[in-house]
Amino acid sequence: MAAYKYETHEYDVVVVGAGGAGLRATLGMAEQGLRTACVTKVFPTRSHTVAAQGGIAASLSNMGPDNWQWHMYDTVKGSDWLGDTDAMEYLAREAPKAVYELEHYGVPFSRTEEGKIYQRPFGGHTTEFGEGPPVQRTCAAADRTGHAILHTLYGQSLKEKAEFFIEYFALDLIITDGACTGVVCWKLDDGTIHVFNAKMVVLATGGYGRAYFSATSAHTCTGDGGGMVARAGLPLQDMEFVQFHPTGIYGSGCLITEGARGEGGYLTNSEGERFMERYAPTYKDLASRDVVSRCITIEIREGRGVGPHKDHMHLNLMHLPPESLAERLPGISESAKIFAGVDVTREPIPILPTVHYNMGGIPTNYWGEVLNPTQDNPDQVFPGLMAVGEAGCASVHGANRLGSNSLIDLVVFGRAAAIRAGQVIDREAQIPTTNKEQVDKALDRFDRIRNADGSVSTADLRLEMQRTMQADAAVFRTDKTLAEGVDKMRVIAGKLSDLKVTDRSLIWNSDLMETLELTNLMPNALATIVAAEARKESRGAHAHEDYPERDDANWRKHSLAWIEGNDVKLAYRPVHLEPLTRQDEGGIDLKKIAPKARVY
């Protein structure tokens, strides 16, 4: 191997990724005086959080009665009873505080007449433990909420003297004596290698939507954290649960926020019928996302799709006043014009369910500490490593995430990780020294990939993986499609060793970067389809046609997947059923969140 010189950096904390969770963690660490570095492969305000449109859920009660227990109930039901009770309680209870903090940091929320934060209805958010009408819980900054939060957190992080390493690509974690002690990075603009030694590494690397052919995710969403964790011999959790957003623009997959339905938009089929009324009589178009995506898919299957190929649906906003569209949904009007050539005030938007969110990820507790579960201790913490945001799996979303629960997940758990790091980091201790053996191992892999001279191009292999995942691990799954998908994916993953990289340079080498990203996507994709094939029930986003019912007796448990090459080993760990606070201390009545049939 060519000898790579590298520069070393010493920090208390290194955060990998600068989206909502990464920046909230970075800001929280820096505020406490911890020496904090944030390493990111794209400029912070280009992170994918910028594309989050609809809003951030918190029971502020600005538009009518609401409380954290109702929010928690909706999150439990949304998760199809796979979320961890302690994490879901923490999310719902801390949400208002986290949103008010954002307001004080300077997020320009939309306002009501009285000057309070404006909140809109969103799918699956209800009152009275699912018995009452829909609630307006989703705090919005027009339809550009993620954009507003990201810019604000980046500015605040700079103010607190966090140091940013921008356009640095994380290659691998450094593991020393069973703890994470740093991360190895490649600086894209000058080709240098950098080793960050730290007392704590926080992975905030986002999801792996790009494992699929059509996704609302940016092309940067390649599951880099999951890939690094898998290579370090740690498991990924609940990977079979992939959310399809009901309304991606037909053809491009560009997201149309659920806020469009929250503001009164509705779906129709080829007969002009508001078909959701048949499937979800109470909440109609605002049922949870997995439900709406399945209903659209059923309508298309039964021949009621629109368009020449009868292969998509319509989202109607024409009946809404143009001034409210301009005020509440300006970005959507623009996206529909650019990506579908549609004027939303005059014609419906063509939409189709599109991969949007990964409920699974790196297993953590509700403080964001990464777990290395064993048979004896399913909650064993892996020292020195945290994961937050879509990269992590706390699991607060279980088998299906509610809309607008992701932005609140980012700030609540980014903040929690900072609080916890402040407690566990010994400020007096030495920063770990460079583990040369681990750095060499990471650079050896980097060099092998850089000089790969096989017969398959990265773009071709990526496309083969994406098409297989889209076809065989989709909205509806069967034993047959999943078994075929597993076989196909094992073969595809096996071809990683036969990749060809044509550009050997180290500076702005997009061919090399995309190849490294593919080596991160592949373990995520493989774990997804293997875990899905094994789960013989339907729960949340995992809709199995051969097992249409949820089976709590056998399957209310988290899957764990260890990936090595094209081989996946599965195990399971129990769901946390205990809340943080007992009912007599003001906690939720556990009878309210006992498993029951999920009807909207």
Swiss-Prot record:
Molecular function (GO) terms for this protein are: electron transfer activity; flavin adenine dinucleotide binding; succinate dehydrogenase (quinone) activity
Q: Tele-8alpha-FAD histidine modification sites?
A: H48
Instruction: Describe the reaction catalysed, as an equation.
Output: a quinone + succinate = fumarate + a quinol
The GO annotation for biological process reads: anaerobic respiration; electron transport chain; tricarboxylic acid cycle
Statement: the UniProt record of this protein carries the keyword Flavoprotein: yes
Q: Indicate how the chain sits in the lipid bilayer.
A: Peripheral membrane protein
List the Gene3D superfamilies. FAD/NAD(P)-binding domain, Fumarate reductase/succinate dehydrogenase flavoprotein-like, C-terminal domain, succinate dehydrogenase protein domain, Succinate dehydrogenase/fumarate reductase flavoprotein, catalytic domain
Q: How does it assemble?
A: Part of an enzyme complex containing four subunits: a flavoprotein, an iron-sulfur, cytochrome b-556, and a hydrophobic anchor protein.
Q: Which NCBIfam families does the record associate with it? A: sdhA_forward (TIGR01816), sdhA_frdA_Gneg (TIGR01812)
Family designation: Belongs to the FAD-dependent oxidoreductase 2 family. FRD/SDH subfamily.
Name this polypeptide is given: Succinate dehydrogenase flavoprotein subunit
Per the UniProt entry, what species is this protein from, by scientific name? Answer: Paracoccus denitrificans
